[in-house]
Amino acid sequence: MDSSVAAEVKEKISSQLVLCGRINSLTCDASGLTYISSMGLRMTLQLSKSYPNFSIIEVQPDVYHVFDMTGFTKIMAIEKALRQLSIDENSKIGEGGIGVVYRASDDSIVKVFREGTTMDQVRNEITMAKEAFVLGMPTPISFDVVRVGSRYGLEYELLHAETLSTCINQHPERMDEYARKYAQLFRQMHHIHVPKGGSIPDSMAREEAAVRHLSRNFDAKSVDLMLGIILSIPKGDRLLHCDLQTKNAMMMGDELMLIDMGEVGYGHPLIDLGHAYSAMVTLLGDYEAIVGMPREYGKQIWDKMIAHYFEGESPEMIAHRNEQIAAVSCVRNFSWLSLSDSFPEALVQECKSNFDERVMKRRDHLLAVSKTFDDWTV
């Protein structure tokens, strides 16, 4: 956009904006812009002053450099164009609730998110991965946000490792060894205090919002019951993964590493363990496709892991803690539907059809158990 066309472009934009009526936010897609002059810069400055929620997206590197060098990136929202990656369907490594993972190169993988996933959700995952890394948790190095066709993706280093699920499948005789490592990973994480004022979110607040979001699928009575359970969990400041099933732990040498960091938060360990139990023991959906091993193995590894996690406690106390964890899992079995608006309708219906049996018919028991949550101090 040089001086010869800037005036004409400004006139066209102004005439279009007049037809729009009240404008709350204005976004300029600059994907076709290869050059911008001082007149073009002044035009964007005028737009940013006229529309407080003004942003420019898909800016090519050379143009972004101009915006950056002139200080415009400090006074308005300007986003670089994302690097485009192409993937081979045959390079698929795994699939989770909100994305599919592919090998991108000899050194990297890319997690491709479902259609409908927002840039904010993608940025949150890469931010949480970096925050957990800084706090001392073993995680893959995260590189960049990319595009794969029309979808967003995250590029990570390729770990020369196997998922914990794969290790258990291949060596079930080492179940106790793997369970101990799994428990150590939880304990390592739950010993980390998350400092106030950082970017890691409050897991309790997020879980409450997720349950309230279910009002589109469940009636008010059902939502209130789930809220009653969740809001009974004590507050906490410990680092939580919130989706640490065995397919989200990678065995690299003798060390387990965390992947899939989109739900990282802080709070009470009961939230984290309840989420994991809902995947490892009571998952709805295709268990082997999601967890990566038979349900029988999942139950075995959970029972052994929780015994190691609470090592030194009496069998009665471990059973009590497991009952508390199971109560929280009854909510997570359904609240995870809020992670995406594009889950298959058949899966949504399966969840709804199981709700009465799993939750409503056990209402009194679940509420009674939730009243004991306060005895779990950290």
What residue spans do the PLM features occupy?
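An alpha-helical support segment within catalytic cores of ATP-dependent transferases
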Residues: 191-242, 246, 252, 370-372
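Amphipathic alpha-helical interaction surfaces in cytosolic regulatory modules
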Residues: 3-76
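Conserved N-terminal boundary motif of the eukaryotic protein kinase catalytic domain
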Residues: 84-92
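ATP/Mg2+ or Mg2+-diphosphate-binding catalytic cores
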Residues: 316, 331-378
